[in-house]
Amino acid sequence: MLRKIDCVMLPVPDLTSATEFYTRVFGLLPLWRDEMSVGMGMPDTDAEVVLHTMDLPVDQSVHYLVDDVPDSVAMAQQAGCYVRRAPFEVVIGMCAVLEDPYGNPVCLLDMSKGQRTS
């Protein structure tokens, strides 16, 4: 079900200074930007570091790509996962937040609307 790590979400107080810092220090390059986040690319993977100013739980920073969020949620729920947040729409498709039987968050994304480019 989990295909890959799609992104790691990092909270920052200022997108402009954080973008400059992650470019200068870590060699990441901006891929896209909106008013609350910037997707930063790494040279050897298509996974992104997403710098953001949103009020999100810090334990939900890693997002896994799946083929279909609603189907994946149903399968995981049958296997014993708890649904912290039911599937909801995001720019690229659908997202949901599960909790495994050990208390760990499992954030799922699909790209049913297509990959973000700007």
Can you describe what each PLM-predicted range is?
Residues G27-R33, Y82-P87:
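Short secondary-structure junctions
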Residues S17, D34-V38, V91, Q115-R116:
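Short glycine/proline-centered loop/turn elements that form peptide/ligand docking sites
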Residues V73, Q78-S118:
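Vicinal oxygen chelate
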Residues L28-Q60, P105-M111:
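Conserved short beta-strand elements that form part of the metal-binding/catalytic scaffold
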Residues M1-T19, D46-A47, Q60-V62, S112-S118:
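N-terminal beta-strand motif that seeds the catalytic metal site of vicinal oxygen chelate
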Residues F21, P70-M75:
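Short amphipathic alpha-helices within nucleic acid-binding modules
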Residues L2-K4, M54-D59, E89-V90:
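Short glycine-enriched loop/turn motifs at secondary-structure junctions
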Residues C7-M9, G39, V50, S61-H63, ...:
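Short aromatic/hydrophobic contact patches that present stacked aromatics
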